[in-house]
Amino acid sequence: CLVGSEMCIRDRCLFAVMLQAARVDTVLVRSAAMNKDVKVVYVLPDKAIGKQACPVVYLLHGYGGNARSWVQLKPELPQMADEKGIIFVCPDGKNSWYWDSPENPAYRYETFVTSELVKYTDGNYATIPDRKARAISGLSMGGHGALWSAIRHKDVFGAAGSMSGGVDIRPFPQNWEMNKQLGEFAANKASWDAHTVVNQLDKIVNGDLALIIDCGEADFFLEVNKDLHNRLLARKIDHDFITRPGGHTGTYWNNSIDYHVLFFDKFFKK
């Protein structure tokens, strides 16, 4: 009957929708380097749930954030995962700035993100275990962390991005607990110099990484991002650099992630 046919059609539509539902997992990943478990949120597209290998984008939160920051900031992330067939991995980086801290041996988040977490992800999910299918990005502290990680571990990541990143920490010596990780600026200038992204560029040449960098025009990190852009130009390192109206806000990053995912998706498909 007609009603029965309509019910069947609706059932098929519901079944199709169910097949395309991304899954959000929260897991504890063991860090041998820090001797503790680290909370990580995984956004898994239907393809990965079905064991079809997918590329991976690691997303790092900002100061004061946690593993759930990105799924809260961008509720559409599961839908984006399904549309692009990308796994998103969002670790809890505390307020570490994603360094292996020279002052605090309990904070070895560079090792965790670039080694332990990548190995866990590739060992437990349907990934493409290759730098050409692996990208990393983040906001604010996480933008610094993403570029820091990728530039220093270009064998692990093929692409990297930064949204409103603190890419030169030295103009902000009293902010965001960085002195807990590096020591007081006045007494440890060499360490601060060595742990800022703009001083890592000698580790890469053009073509090593696909890079996207953006910052709001009303952001307090705008000038350090412009400086990074100019340093990359001076070294003839190709990169996308975007400034748009906006400040250091969730509204800005909710928009930024769209640009970064598009950039990474194109990189993965090369």
Q: What would you call each of these model-derived segments?
A:
Residues 1-11:
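Single conserved hydrophobic/aromatic residue that forms the stacking wall/gate
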Residues 12-21:
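Hydrophobic h-region of N-terminal signal peptides that target proteins for export
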Residues 21-270:
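Non-catalytic cap/lid and distal C-terminal segments of serine-dependent acyl enzymes
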